[in-house]
Amino acid sequence: KVLFDFHSAAIDTDIIQDEDGMYHVFFKTEGGRKKGYRQYITKDLHNFASWGLLPYNCEDTHKAVEGAGVFQLIDGDWVMMYDCYIDGHYQFCTSKDLITFKRKQDTATKGMFTPRHGTVITITKKELKRLEKAFPNTK
């Protein structure tokens, strides 16, 4: 079943639920002249009539982007990361409200750091210790 129909090409959707139970549906527009990340906000993912579309793009750049991932930091701030694939870097933007994102850092995608459409998960200290034991740092 189709989750939503933007009435033109849309790819790379990421759905986040905030502390108030609101869903933030980030997606990249591929149709039309102005491509970029847009956002719907809703309380009910299964009632498209209740979705509200923000009137602007979310990314803090005019460069071509794709593969966004949104995650929350331990301090409560949010990060949107995406691939500036033509320019050869990943861009990280931060937000306190999941509405306004400001560029924090560009990281060159070269050498060992060449992510494409990645994601971030939170792990506990116990999980970190298990991972470090299973995959020791040999350098």
Question: Which sequence ranges carry the predicted segments?
Answer:
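Carbohydrate-active catalytic/glycan-binding domains of CAZyme proteins
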Residues: K1-K139
